[in-house]
Each structure stands twice: as structure tokens, then as C-alpha cells.
Amino acid sequence: MAKNSMKAREAKRAKLVAKFAEKRAALKAIISDVNASEEDRWNAVLTLQSLPRDSSASRQRNRCNQTGRPHGYLRKFGLSRIKVREACMKGEIPGLRKASW
């Protein structure tokens, strides 16, 4: 199990990403716009740099919903490989079976 502080930190990052998503997208559009003036683009870069670091989506880490484990995460289920296996063996995931050949 991951520490509760790590889970809380990820939740905080998710809130920040949602809060600043529109502002970041607008600034990035200005930065990548070749028709904008150099001064506008430079101001957009500086404004983007002044935003909180954790408001960037790339700083988020996918974690297991049950344990908070960061590695072996399966997007389709939102769980780590260990918890997916346990749920599969209990028959809690419809249509998923252990492979046999």
C-alpha cells in the first residue's frame, strides 16, 4: 500500500490540473501561434512558467485505486496488476479469465 500522503499528493495534483487546464491550453496556443508577436509569445511563456508546477498534466502518476501502487497499473481497470489478478480470481471482473493453452 502506498502512503496516504502520496495518495493525497496525487489527488491535489489532479485538482490543480483540472483548475488550470483551460489557462494552460490558452497559453500554449499563444506560444505555438506563429502569427502572434514575439512579445505576446514571450509573455505567454513567462505566464506559463509562473503557474504551479503541479498543474502540468505530465506530473500526474497513474495509481491503483485500491492500493495506490504506482507500478503495474492497468488503465482499463484503474487497478494494479496484483489487484486485477485478485479480482479476476474472485470472478469480480466480467469476461476476464486466466489464460490457459
Swiss-Prot record:
**Chloroplast among the record's keywords?**
no
Gene Ontology biological process terms in this record: translation
Spell out the Pfam families in the cross-references.
Ribosomal_S14 (PF00253)
Q: Which UniProt keywords apply?
A: Ribonucleoprotein, Ribosomal protein, RNA-binding, rRNA-binding
Q: Which family does it belong to?
A: Belongs to the universal ribosomal protein uS14 family.
Subunit details? Part of the 30S ribosomal subunit. Contacts proteins S3 and S10.
What exactly does this protein do?
A: Binds 16S rRNA, required for the assembly of 30S particles and may also be responsible for determining the conformation of the 16S rRNA at the A site.
Task: Supply the name of the protein.
Answer: Small ribosomal subunit protein uS14
High-level lineage: Bacteria, Pseudomonadati, Pseudomonadota, Gammaproteobacteria, Vibrionales
Q: Which gene encodes it?
A: rpsN
